[in-house]
Amino acid sequence: MVHPVKLGRNVRMSYSKIDEVIDMPNLIEIQKNSYEQFLKEGFKEVFKDVNPITDYTGNLILEFVDYSLDEPPKYSVDECKERDATYAAPLKVKVRLINKETGEVKEQEIFMGDFPLMTETGTFIINGAERVIVSQLVRSPGIYYAMKIDKAGKQLFSNTVIPNRGAWLEYETDSNDVLSVRIDRTRKLPLTVLVRALGYGTDLEITELFGEDERILATIQKDSTKTEEEGLLEIYKRLRPGEPPTVESAKALLHGLFFDPKRYDLAKPGRFKFNKKLSIAARIHGFIAGENIKDPDTGEIIVAEGETISREKAETIQNAGVNTVILRVDGKNVKVIGNDMVDIKRYVDFDPKEIGINEKVKRDVLMEILEEYKGKGDDAIKKALQERIDDLIPKHITKEDIISSISYIIGLSYGIGSTDDIDHLGNRRLRSVGELLQNQFRIGLSRMERVVRERMTIQDLDVVTPQALINIRPVAAAIKEFFGSSQLSQFMDQTNPLAELTHKRRLSALGPGGLSRERAGFEVRDVHHSHYGRMCPIETPEGPNIGLIGSLSTYARVNEYGFIETPYRKVSKEEPGKVTNEIVYLTADEEDEYIIAQANEPLDEEGRFISNKVVCRYKEEFIEVDPSKIDFMDVSPKQIVSVATSMIPFLENDDANRALMGANMQRQAVPLIKTESPIVGTGIEYRAARDSGVVILAKNPGVVEKVTANEIIIRTKDGKRDTYKLLKYMRSNQGTCINQRPIVKKGEEVEAGDVIADGPSTDNGEIALGKNVLVGFMTWEGYNYEDAILISERLVKDDVFTSIHIEEYEAEARDTKLGPEDITREIPNVSEDALKDLNSEGIIRIGAEVRAGDILVGKVTPKGETELTAEERLLRAIFGEKAREVRDTSLRVPHGESGIVVDVKIFTRENGDELAPGVNKLVRVYVAQKRKISVGDKMAGRHGNKGVISRILPVEDMPFLPDGTPLDIVLNPLGVPSRMNIGQVLEVHLGYAAKALGWKVATPVFDGATEEDIVQTLRKAGLAEDGKSILYDGRTGEPFENRVTVGYMYMLKLAHLVDDKIHARSTGPYSLVTQQPLGGKAQFGGQRFGEMEVWALEAYGAAYTLQEILTVKSDDVVGRVKTYEAIVKGENVPEPGIPECFKVLIKELQSLCLDVKVYSEEQEEIAIKESVEDDLEELNVNIEGREDEVNFNEFNDIGEEITDEDLEVEDFDLQDLNDDDINPDDTIDAELDDNLFDDDFDDTFDDDDL
């Protein structure tokens, strides 16, 4: 029954029935562990891969000895955000240069660039912006077998050998039973050609190797080569057509393709998958032995002929070093060949993990070492094993692997082995931050290696130093490029704490080396049975990326090979049917071998299954089994879903499509001024807030000594003082407000890990994305048609859904060719009234209220001028630069924006701030707005029930309860049945009862309150059991006809606010080529009157309207200015002229070499002006709202050298790239020429009226 649960500082009444035996892991460990692993091991591995670099003669040897990243970063995290710097520490590498001729050894420590560090919360600060590296789901290296059925109904098998890097090998069978191979995506060859090239030259050797199989015989027949040499030459001809083939070069080519660790790399996961797939044990168990199987060392028979091989015996066979087994299948003997790898534990007495071996090793190498060091003690063996670890666990493919993989494809047609499913999570792995960085670092180092080699040949051998050989630029560039512009390095979604957390746990199948949106079919995107407990089946974007981007499940973790594991409770083998508290993490392919019970299966006190038959999962099926057959049990019902999904109460009663929207919309909830945790929660809110990193946690236990809005001081047990600084009104990446508030009092005792301050969207340490409001499900005068929402004015008056949004504006004073720009209060042609809030330097004061068009930073730019005469130059020289012409390029508040200036930051060269080249001063102004909820804003519940506010009713008109309480929100009941998200109705019922009892409740997903529980809680609260109530119409006081479902629902205000979307324009910028208005709010564009709209006007015969829209309101350059003047002066609108698109058409025809002339009705030729500028000069009126056409070469003359810094990727903004004539340095200015202003024009035509 319902019981209290303590979550942090809060107590919730929980309806859960299952005791969870394991705590949830830290939710951002996927980021942190991966990065730490990279710092510890990744660097070493990469350096080991490039070591040593030798010159072409082998005389100079350069090796990387050691590295350090210990120095503290130059700036703290907060300073980096403020200064647009990267949070990074210097990477120093110790390099040794050995000259073999002279025996001279030089060592030097070399700085290899700044390496970005991860913050406490799992993010990176790159150029001042907080970014997240998303983990990538890719196909694991390994061997994959597939089957297709041809027209005759025959099974054809094929396989692909995929390395981490290197050439692919693909085998296939055709309908004539001929086996062929493609090497590195070239044309097909008979497979026996490859086998011959590997050293099995004659037909006899091949048939002895694989047995007398019809496929092998058919292939031999088709194969034109007959010896090893011929095989090698045949392969060489295929791969290097046009070069003279020799046996030597062919051998070298084959070796370079597959057996050179520098060019062919399986990586750890690849070797692991190879051994798993090709191991003889996995292939023979369950089959009948065709001959006696003997231990090669002792000669004893492990399995006798005709005996069925058990799993245990199969393991024994493999570890005894038996590599070939004859099986009897349907009366035929079939030969199965393994890849000769054994478990080292059977051969040595110590634990091989001590020396870093935890996979199978190559038998022949192991035997060689053990023979050599027999009787010399364990330490000698350990040392020898460590020295030859690359031979024991080869990183490249081996000859045995290739032979074994061919044996596998032959065995498949006898039913030995199995084909693979590429979408199974056992065959897909994660590349997390660490590995992605390691790959990038490797690319940088290999580019550097080339440079080092070249320099070794050029430089004087006697005086050469490591520093002179090494150029760190390629390394620094590779890292910078990865963080700045990789598809997987993303600008952090910081709308609210849940958005941050989810972003760090995201799994993407896109990105370099992954899939592309266009190529991904349905299968890849589908939910797969192996996703259970690893990847959330609910949370994924709607749209083109659906199914390609997922989210890690709550309990999942990533193992050392990059496969996702999920925890299970072990069922005791000694007492079948009894569940222990031992936790085992399984990967997807391990899980496929076991039968697993659900977490909500009832157990008795001792942990035994109560039912005689238990519904379980086995692979992709649900089966009913006896309790004694069960191997594992789920640890928690919420282990299958992600964090965001597990925050939806009554998820089990919602349709999956709507739950998907609910999970995604929680990430878009805007932080409100006053937060309030949900009455109906799921109990995960506390953990999510704690791990998201927005709340402050006490580092050490102690007593609170001082609390202010800005800092908390805690005196620890050993008398030290810990000071915690709080963030106040900072701007997030998405423009929402980050603000922390203390929740402890002076004198309070705290433990380490306790929440001591709330962040945005958290309440008392729990995530609080919205508000609990009283809703009723009823229609009201059609105002909630089509999911619209009717709200009470109380939500506006009491600031229930009010949020703060902070916008950042920046102005920089640069050096131009005509002289430096100046930030100043002296601006030409600006009234004193417009300058009233600027200080003496021309920068707005903090606290000033600003509207659209107000000046934030006064700035003037020198104007271009004609060549001066000698006299003028002399006067200039005598009287200084005062007479210079300047134009106003001040930073103004853009159209439609307003607010209060909350902060101003000034960076100058004089103060030692690092600025971009050519910038002398940078000013950042932060403007905050309080946005109350308004008509047009989007709101949503947690069940995918979203809508737009259609009307705000006065409180007195809202329907009210019998005790006089008015509703806050009226929702449409028709939004529930067809969408099948019944969870919202249950939430409302439970919220109604819980509010009446003064409870906050937790109803965990798949383990929450049942209908019975809700009815009982309603009864306990003294409310009607159906959760309905009589409502009275606020306007008349009459009761409504039927009783209405009312209760408390948790509603979110989403980031789609109407203020950011509404937009109007009378005149503004035009596109350069077509002279039509630009489009979109960002460009201050117009509304497109498209083809279909034109048809509508044509259909009505509205000729004049149509003419106007196609000419003066669009691209008739002269006509639109004349029309504008006519409106201002109150005259009649003139006749339209020739639209620009007509001129463009003529130009297009002329470009096809057609001589086109234009004639009037009187047969007179009309001169078409060549360029718009000719027209504009005659008109001398500018309605575009900017001073003059943008000059692209203003700051970068062809003569100037463009430096790397100018091309910084970060500086690009997509909106700047949208149109060719928008220059990011030019603020679009909607001011009109002064001489045009007329008082009544100003009154009648106002932006607010639009």
From Swiss-Prot:
PROSITE patterns on file: RNA_POL_BETA
Keyword annotations: DNA-directed RNA polymerase, Nucleotidyltransferase, Transcription, Transferase
Biological process (GO) annotations held by this record are: DNA-templated transcription
Q: Which GO terms describe its cellular component?
A: DNA-directed RNA polymerase complex
Provide the residue span(s) of the region labelled Disordered.
1215-1250
Its EC top class is transferase
Q: Give the enzyme's EC designation.
A: 2.7.7.6
GO terms for molecular function, please? DNA binding; DNA-directed RNA polymerase activity; ribonucleoside binding
Which ranges does the record mark as transmembrane?
A: none
Keyword Transferase set for record = yes
Q: Which domain of life is it from?
A: Bacteria
Which reaction(s) are listed as its catalytic activity? Answer: RNA(n) + a ribonucleoside 5'-triphosphate = RNA(n+1) + diphosphate
Q: Which CDD domains match?
A: RNA_pol_B_RPB2
InterPro entries per the record?
A: DNA-dir_RNA_pol_bsu_ext_1_sf (IPR042107), DNA-dir_RNA_pol_bsu_external_1 (IPR019462), DNA-dir_RNA_pol_su2 (IPR015712), DNA-dir_RNAP_su2_dom (IPR007120), DNA-dir_RNAP_su2_hyb_sf (IPR037033), RNA_pol_bsu_bac (IPR010243), RNA_pol_bsu_CS (IPR007121), RNA_pol_bsu_protrusion (IPR007644)
- Name a Pfam family for this protein: RNA_pol_Rpb2_1
Q: Which family does it belong to?
A: Belongs to the RNA polymerase beta chain family.
What is said about its interaction partners and assembly? The RNAP catalytic core consists of 2 alpha, 1 beta, 1 beta' and 1 omega subunit. When a sigma factor is associated with the core the holoenzyme is formed, which can initiate transcription.
Function description: DNA-dependent RNA polymerase catalyzes the transcription of DNA into RNA using the four ribonucleoside triphosphates as substrates.
Protein name in UniProt: DNA-directed RNA polymerase subunit beta
In its UniProt entry, the species of origin is given as Acetivibrio thermocellus (strain ATCC 27405 / DSM 1237 / JCM 9322 / NBRC 103400 / NCIMB 10682 / NRRL B-4536 / VPI 7372)
Report the gene name: rpoB
